[in-house]
């Protein structure tokens, strides 16, 4: 395996065409050769090999592109050929020197010129972000004017959606994590809105947008897509020319999470009372919302708009499973894998059912899926890890690494934990999973000892912390105003609480009712000072569903310590909502989400 790639992975500018790439061998490992052309869309992820290699099948490689007979006439499992073909057309179209040759509206042409050539004062769009939007524009405005050459792409999309999403038309834009999906969303909204406002009779464009996220924390971060947000991308990142900002203000945008699509009870009736009434009337009492009532609750701003565009963030959670095959798949799974499959399907079912309701009641022209991993999940009834067949653009992690957009992921090739031929840190969960706490943070969760976590996990934390400590010191010496961020992702809330306590400190309860402090084992992450007092501005925060609801990860003195930042947050809320009372009462859960969303930002919570 070549070390050249790992020593010097960056070949291209993030703002220009990625005209070079590292060659990969048959096993997906980098060679010494740099090829003077763009990388084709292939689903290969190069990482350093362990000292002892396992077979490709054991490593869980994607089966895309194999000869296993996964594709049918109705459902393609390997859309990468169509992605490369679309890419070729878009590149030729982009190279046309005269905007009159672009076959787009004057407004679209102006936006394209702005994104490609404007001298941005701040953050400039990456090539991959512009390309994703160019792909959407080309498929919408250009391809229909090319006769049979363009019709084949519409036919592909219709066929890909017919089986998986019969009520919807979806286009997936695949962007590596860190490549900036939010900016792409802002550009899509700008393109649609400006055209819809200036061509009100056109059925091709819309100024109504439903943005769906998988959770409230992601939803909060997407608020920069609202035109009236203090940090709105349209103005602060110059997504549109100044004279188009007034058009953007006419956009109707709703940002929600998929949970909002669940039909709610309109009347609270006790179980016994319900049974008595239903027995007397001999019919079921309908107390659930109708679809129309749900939509009125979730998106009242969009109720008068007939052509809505949906933007799905982290869209791999949204699909219509094959019911028979999904049941068979779940039957083959056991334990946590079976629970995961059921949870995946429940999430997907609620998400896509909500979009189908929007289509039936209001009208929906297009769904744009944005995800780094637009793959079918376990239990979907499709082959796990197969790409959504309506994926039409791809900027992979390897592309992002070669353009310097994301750092090279580091995975262990060796460790100092004795036993075994392969590094345990490489697949840590395989070695500690059965010894980790199960789901839930009830009474049993409180009796678990953070200092009794598996040795392999504690050793991994110490190893990563050692690297963090060196980076922290370098940043301090260079005068960087914020510390680097250390993120630990856990499988459930019990595990996250134990790791949190191990890292930051906790009070141990004794049999006689007294407590004693066990300070955090990683000094820079401690939430207690040397005298055992809790630090008002914590070095470590715990973010999970329970914490977001309770908000109890923040010390009572935090509000006083962060008074200036909290006041700035109140003003932001008022500007964002145009409600003078929005900042009067900020609950701890909202405050905790804001803390998480502004980690690493100066003068923020």
What are these regions (language model features)?
Residues 1-605:
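RecA-like P-loop NTPase motor core of helicase/translocase proteins
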């Amino acid at each position: 395996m070549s070390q050249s790639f790992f020593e010097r992975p960056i070949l291209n500018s993030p703002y220009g065409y990625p005209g070079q790439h590292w060659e990969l061998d048959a096993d997906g490992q980098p060679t010494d050769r740099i090829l003077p052309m763009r990388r084709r869309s292939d689903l290969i992820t190069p990482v350093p090999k362990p000292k002892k290699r396992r077979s490709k099948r054991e490593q869980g490689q994607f089966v895309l592109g194999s000869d296993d007979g996964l594709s049918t006439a109705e459902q393609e499992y390997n859309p990468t050929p169509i992605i490369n073909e679309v890419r070729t057309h878009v590149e030729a179209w982009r190279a046309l020197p005269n905007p009159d040759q672009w076959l787009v509206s004057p407004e679209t042409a102006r936006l394209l010129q702005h994104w490609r050539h404007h001298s941005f004062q701040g953050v400039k769009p990456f090539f991959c972000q512009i390309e994703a939007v160019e792909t959407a524009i080309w498929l919408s405005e250009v391809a229909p004017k090319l006769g049979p050459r363009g019709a084949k792409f519409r036919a592909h999309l219709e066929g890909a959606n017919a089986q998986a999403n019969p009520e919807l038309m979806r286009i997936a834009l695949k962007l590596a994590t860190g490549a900036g999906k939010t900016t792409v969303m802002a550009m899509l909204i700008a393109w649609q809105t400006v055209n819809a406002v200036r061509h009100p009779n056109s059925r091709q464009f819309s100024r109504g947008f439903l943005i769906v996220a998988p959770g409230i924390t992601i939803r909060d971060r997407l608020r920069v897509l609202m035109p009236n947000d203090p940090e709105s991308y349209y103005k602060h990142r110059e997504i549109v020319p100044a004279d188009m900002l007034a058009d953007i203000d006419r956009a109707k945008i709703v940002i929600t999470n998929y949970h909002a699509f669940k039909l709610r009870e309109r009347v609270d009736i006790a179980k016994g009372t319900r049974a008595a009434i239903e027995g007397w009337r001999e019919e079921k009492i309908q107390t659930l919302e109708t679809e129309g009532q749900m939509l009125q609750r979730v998106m009242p701003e969009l109720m008068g708009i007939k052509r809505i565009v949906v933007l799905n963030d982290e869209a791999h959670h949204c699909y219509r499973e094959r019911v028979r095959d999904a049941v068979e798949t779940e039957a083959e799974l056991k334990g946590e894998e079976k629970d995961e499959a059921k949870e995946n399907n429940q999430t997907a079912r609620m998400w896509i059912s909500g979009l189908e309701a929007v289509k039936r009641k209001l009208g929906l022209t297009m769904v744009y899926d944005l995800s780094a991993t637009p793959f079918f999940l376990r239990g979907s009834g499709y082959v796990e890890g197969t790409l959504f067949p309506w994926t039409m653009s791809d900027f992979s992690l390897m592309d992002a690494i070669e353009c310097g957009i994301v750092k090279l992921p580091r995975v262990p090739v060796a460790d100092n934990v004795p036993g075994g031929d392969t590094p345990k840190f490489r697949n840590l969960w395989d070695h500690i999973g059965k010894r980790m706490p199960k789901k839930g943070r009830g009474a049993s969760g409180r009796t678990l000892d953070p200092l009794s976590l598996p040795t392999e996990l504690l050793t991994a934390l110490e190893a990563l912390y050692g690297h963090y400590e060196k980076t922290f010191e370098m940043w301090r010496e260079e005068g960087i105003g914020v510390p680097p961020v250390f993120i630990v992702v856990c499988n459930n809330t019990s595990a996250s609480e134990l790791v949190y306590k191990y890292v930051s400190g906790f009070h141990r309860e004794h049999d006689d009712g007294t407590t004693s402090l066990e300070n955090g084992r990683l000094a820079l992450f401690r939430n207690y000072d040397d005298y055992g007092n809790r630090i008002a501005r914590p070095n470590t925060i715990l973010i999970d569903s329970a914490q977001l609801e309770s908000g109890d990860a923040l010390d009572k003195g935090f509000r006083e310590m962060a008074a200036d930042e909290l006041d700035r947050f109140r003003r932001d809320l008022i500007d964002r909502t145009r409600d003078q009372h929005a900042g009067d009462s900020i609950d701890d859960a909202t405050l905790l989400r804001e803390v998480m969303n502004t980690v690493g930002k100066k003068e923020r919570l």
